[in-house]
């Protein structure tokens, strides 16, 4: 079980925490890195809404899954991962004032969902997650005309691995996305037009 915290100080930007969160909610997908897609619903990021997302994995595989908006107020919102996501847990996006400067923050509480994702975390997933949220915060800060470093901290809260949850592999979104892509490539080729029959 891990807690990861990423934050960026919006030094020099005359913007309140509430204004940062309002923009972040409205343009959430636009702040994501270019290789990831977040399909924001028309009604906005409101509690109870399920949002679809696509992320590029190593090997040019695309993971398709979703998150549910668990909570939202003027200065924060929280999403919870759907079944089959690499990590079970939630992400909280918030903004607050610190020493007269508005700070934007992403905090994750996460545990690998199955043994395959446990192995992926060691191999590459932690680094991917770090790059993703650092880039997201850089993009958010750039919207307000700020270039600043992202400070981040990773804390391991529980060293135990839940091997008893091996059955969750059945719901693994990366495996299912890969099988869907493979089936689409190897499936029967459909003609683009109906051939003309001669009599």
Where are these regions (language model features)?
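Hydrophobic ligand-binding cavity/cleft-lining segments
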Residues: 1-58, 169-199
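Short, surface-exposed beta-strand/loop "edge" segments at domain boundaries and coil↔beta transitions
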Residues: 15-16, 60-63, 114-117
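Short, intrinsically disordered, mixed-charge
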Residues: 22-30, 84, 100, 138, ...
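Short hydrophobic/aromatic-rich beta-strand segments that constitute the beta-sheet cores
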Residues: 53, 77-80, 104-106
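Hydrophobic-ligand binding "helix-grip"
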Residues: 58-99
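Beta-strand/loop substructures that line and gate deep hydrophobic ligand-binding cavities in soluble
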Residues: 83-128
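Compositionally biased, charge-rich terminal segments
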Residues: 107-112, 143-173, 199
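A conserved amphipathic terminal alpha-helix motif
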Residues: 117-157
């Amino acid at each position: 079980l891990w807690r990861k915290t990423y934050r960026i100080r919006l030094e020099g930007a005359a913007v309140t925490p509430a204004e940062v969160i309002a923009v972040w909610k409205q343009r959430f997908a636009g702040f994501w890195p270019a290789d990831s897609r977040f399909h924001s619903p028309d009604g906005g990021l409101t509690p109870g809404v399920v949002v679809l997302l696509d992320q590029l994995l190593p090997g040019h595989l695309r993971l398709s899954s979703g998150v549910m908006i668990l909570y939202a107020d003027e200065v924060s919102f929280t999403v919870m991962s759907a079944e089959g996501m690499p990590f079970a847990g939630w992400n909280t996006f918030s903004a607050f004032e610190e020493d007269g400067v508005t700070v934007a923050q992403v905090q994750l509480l996460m545990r690998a969902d199955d043994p395959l994702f446990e192995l992926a975390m060691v191999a590459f997933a932690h680094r991917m997650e770090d790059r993703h949220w650092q880039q997201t915060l850089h993009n958010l800060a750039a919207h307000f005309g700020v270039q600043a470093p992202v400070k981040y901290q990773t804390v391991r809260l529980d060293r135990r691995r839940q091997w008893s949850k091996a059955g969750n592999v059945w719901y693994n979104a990366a495996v299912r996305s890969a099988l869907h892509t493979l089936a689409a490539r190897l499936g029967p080729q459909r003609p683009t037009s109906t051939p003309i029959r001669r009599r």
